[in-house]
């Protein structure tokens, strides 16, 4: 008799996705982040659900309700700290996952890559509206500054901003709708993740060499289930260490002050995972230009497949491209640092140069490096 997991309509889908899935035998730990992101999403949805049971989305009580969760709800402090730091873990895994995709040429699976970029944007939107909910100073002013950017859109900008606010400033209506968005978006993300996996399983995973892996595949279970569990334990240890020993390490002290529309914090800045994009936004001394650069900093990922000029898929055997990749990584770290600094010299100039080099490396230097490497690999004798 055939095993039920191979015949039952639902079990068959699970079996073909997580058990009998043919997987390249040589994928490294860089391929662990997909499963870690799945776990992060589940952790965020579960902790978020329990937080939503005690949170009130009203300007008068939102801040107090978060304090109430931390003080009076059983393990509320832990649930809140896991949720807040879980977002940081989520983005850390996301950035490493995208970086892996760029390094090993995973973007050549265009459908998987494109839905992945849309997922990244959706997760960023979810994190932004979520950050507004505790209704601290940085929540309020972050919401005011970022939503105000839409007013740079010609003709419809001002109307659009007031429509999103539900009034003439960030107020009760804004908080209520942001809570609604923050509740629904993770479930939309979950559906998109299924589509992401669907596209991935059409082609199968790539591998570090960039060569066709079809000649040597192994079943996902037990090999990669065990490998994923190891990665999962490491991530959980880091997350729990953060949540229990230094839960406020990555937060902003200003958010411990209730929102006050009459008092602007000296430095308005988002959470660390948005700082690179915020630095690019601030480096352009024009509102509309800054907004376009901000969008371009993420949307540039969509054109990466078109900029692939190399005859090899992976960067594993391409030292010039590797150097550029690590320059890009260092550049993003510099942008993240600059995004958290005040708008004064020398930070302004550093931010502008880092923003220029970010786009230059991706759009100009990487395609040129691919062409140069192709030329260097050509036999020079008849």
UniProtKB/Swiss-Prot annotation:
Heme b b562 binds at residues 83, 182. The chain crosses the membrane at residues 33-53, 77-98, 113-133, 178-198, 226-246, 288-308, 320-340, 347-367. GO terms for molecular function: metal ion binding; ubiquinol-cytochrome-c reductase activity. PROSITE patterns: CYTB_CTER, CYTB_NTER. Its main location: mitochondrion. GO terms for biological process: mitochondrial electron transport, ubiquinol to cytochrome c. Binds 2 heme b groups non-covalently. Heme b b566 binds at residues 97, 196. Disulfide bonds: none annotated. Pfam families: Cytochrom_B_C (PF00032), Cytochrome_B (PF00033). One of its GO terms (cellular component) is mitochondrial inner membrane. A ubiquinone binds at residue 201. Signal peptide: none annotated. It comes from the Eukaryota. It is a multi-pass membrane protein. Component of the ubiquinol-cytochrome c reductase complex (complex III or cytochrome b-c1 complex) that is part of the mitochondrial respiratory chain. The b-c1 complex mediates electron transfer from ubiquinol to cytochrome c. Contributes to the generation of a proton gradient across the mitochondrial membrane that is then used for ATP synthesis. Belongs to the cytochrome b family. Heme 1 (or BL or b562) is low-potential and absorbs at about 562 nm, and heme 2 (or BH or b566) is high-potential and absorbs at about 566 nm. PANTHER family: CYTOCHROME B (PTHR19271:SF16). This is Cytochrome b.
